[in-house]
A protein has these predicted regions:
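Auxiliary alpha/beta "docking" domains used to position bulky ligands
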Residues: 1-132, 136-140, 168, 187-188
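Iron-sulfur cluster-binding cysteine motifs and their immediate structural context
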Residues: 146-168, 172-188
Length: 188
């Protein structure tokens, strides 16, 4: 990410230049943090604000965690539930949790849900040992080039996404690279 920013490929997303330390170390963002619990929610066609939907689910999960492990499982003084709202490397945490891989379209792709997902996180103050933790999923795009070929501006080039060339960066409405992705077939 640092190299991508240094090359100016992030365009005017200046917020990506700030708080880099927090992006790489959640304990700076949430003092006492030891674990990032991640979840994915498939795109909702209803038009509801996904931030609210994901956070609502995470607040319910937080209540269950507090019931099971006590109030100290989360920070009482710092925001610890996030959905596209804090300097978090959301895709990185999802990959590490085994929830998907980063595809050639530079999106997180879950093998079943596809890339039309919204991640959310709860940062907790306890280490978590998961007996059946999934290993990170290998990049499964193989020889597929559909997203690269579908990109109307050439913003997707092999290992690089150039935000300054991406239509979604300027309009928020281009999904061409996702619409052609085989992992999104029949998922709408």
């Amino acid at each position: 990410m640092d190299q991508w920013i240094a090359q100016g490929l992030h365009g005017n997303m200046d917020y990506l230049e700030r708080n880099r330390d927090k992006r790489y170390d959640p304990s700076i963002l949430v003092p006492g943090a030891q674990t990032v619990v991640v979840c994915l929610l498939h795109f909702d066609k209803s038009g509801r604000d996904y931030h609210r939907t994901v956070k609502s689910l995470l607040f319910r999960l937080e209540a269950r965690l507090k019931e099971e492990f006590g109030e100290d499982i989360v920070s009482p003084t710092h925001q610890h539930i996030f959905c596209d709202s804090a300097p978090m490397l959301e895709r990185r945490w999802c990959v590490e949790a085994g929830l998907g891989f980063i595809g050639k379209n530079h999106q997180l792709i879950h093998p079943t849900l596809g890339s039309m997902v919204h991640p959310g996180e709860i940062v907790i103050n306890s280490p978590v040992s998961i007996a059946n933790r999934q290993s990170p999923i290998a990049q499964l795009c193989a020889d597929c080039q559909l997203c690269l070929e579908a990109c109307p501006t050439g913003a997707l080039r092999n290992e690089v996404w150039d935000a300054t060339q991406c239509v979604a960066y300027t309009t928020h409405h281009c999904l061409e690279c996702q619409l052609v992705c085989p992992y999104n077939e029949a998922k709408g």
